[in-house]
Amino acid sequence: MDEGFILANKFRRVIFDELVAGENDIKRIAKKNRMIPRVAQRIIDEFVTGGIVEKKGNYYVFTDEGKKLVETIGK
């Protein structure tokens, strides 16, 4: 997964930025940004499938590949 995939969609960018900021609960991210929860869940599932985040319990954290994207995209 590359930065173009994330930057091409505003919801992907919002979720990515929230994860970078330290928020790791997808339900809180969706509520805070007034997103439909199912859309937020679908996007985070894409991130998991793409290998940039992984689920730890009820929370999501960046993988090594995800950390590289954080450095590339930045904030």
Model-predicted segments: where are they?
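Short intrinsically disordered terminal tails
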Residues: M1, G74-K75
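Short glycine/proline-centered loop/turn elements that form peptide/ligand docking sites
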Residues: G4-I6, Q41-R42, D64
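A short, conserved structural fragment
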Residues: V48-N58
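Short capping segments at the starts of secondary-structure elements
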Residues: V20-D25
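Short alpha-helical segments that sit at the start of domains
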Residues: M1-I15
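A short acidic, leucine-rich amphipathic alpha-helix
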Residues: R28-K32
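Short amphipathic alpha-helical interaction segments
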Residues: R34-V48
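Basic, amphipathic "hinge/linker" alpha-helix immediately C-terminal to the N-terminal HTH DNA-binding motif
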Residues: N58-I73
